C-alpha cells in the first residue's frame, strides 16, 4: 500500500476457465445449473482492472491446476500477481527487489538469510545478468556463443541437463541450464 498498490480479490469460481493453458478443476453451480471452474490464474481479471484505470494492482491468492503432482508441483498453491501501468521490465525488477528486501527485513530483522548452507544477502539492488551471462559465469559455457543447437544440447548434457526434446534450440538449452 505504501507504493500505491490496491489489493484486489478476483473471483475464485469462473465460467469459462481463463488465463492459462492449464487444466482447471470443475465444479457445478446448482442454482445457475452451470459448470464453473476453479481459477487457474488471476492474470486476466487484474489486467482488466489495469485497462479500466487502476494503475497498480495485486493479489495474493490461491490458484488451482488439475495437472500432475510431484514434490515441486501441487494442484493448489498460493501466488502473488502484481501489475503496474507505465513501467517496464526494469521497473518491475526494482519493485520485486524492494518487495524481497523489505519482506526479509520485516520477517527476519535483517536482509540476510541462510539457505541450504549459503548466506544470501537480499539487500537491494540485486546483481542483474542476462541469462546467457549468468550461465556463462557459473558454468564457464557460452550457450549463445557455441556453433549450433546440437552443440548447445551437448553442453547441456555435459552439465547434467538432459533435454527431453532432442531438437531443442540453444535458447531452450539455455533456459533449462538457467
Model-derived segments and their meaning:
Residues 1-178:
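Class II aminoacyl-tRNA synthetase catalytic cores and aaRS-like
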Amino acid at each position: 500500500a505504501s507504493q500505491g498498490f490496491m489489493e484486489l480479490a478476483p473471483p475464485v469460481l469462473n465460467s469459462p476457465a481463463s488465463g492459462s493453458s492449464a487444466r482447471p478443476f470443475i465444479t457445478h453451480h446448482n442454482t445457475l445449473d452451470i459448470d464453473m471452474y476453479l481459477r487457474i490464474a488471476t492474470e486476466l481479471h487484474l489486467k482488466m482492472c489495469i485497462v479500466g484505470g487502476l494503475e497498480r494492482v495485486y493479489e495474493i491468492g490461491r490458484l488451482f491446476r488439475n495437472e500432475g503432482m510431484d514434490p515441486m508441483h501441487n494442484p493448489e498453491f498460493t501466488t502473488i500477481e502484481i501489475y503496474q501501468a507505465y513501467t517496464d521490465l526494469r521497473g518491475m525488477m526494482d519493485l520485486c527487489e524492494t518487495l524481497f528486501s523489505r519482506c526479509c527485513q520485516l520477517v527476519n530483522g535483517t536482509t540476510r538469510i541462510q539457505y541450504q548452507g549459503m548466506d544470501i544477502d537480499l539487500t537491494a539492488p540485486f546483481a542483474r545478468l542476462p541469462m546467457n551471462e549468468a550461465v556463462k559465469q557459473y558454468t564457464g559455457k557460452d550457450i549463445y556463443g557455441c556453433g549450433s543447437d546440437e552443440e548447445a544440447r551437448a553442453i547441456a548434457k555435459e552439465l547434467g541437463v538432459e533435454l527431453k526434446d532432442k531438437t531443442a534450440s540453444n535458447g531452450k538449452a539455455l533456459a533449462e541450464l538457467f
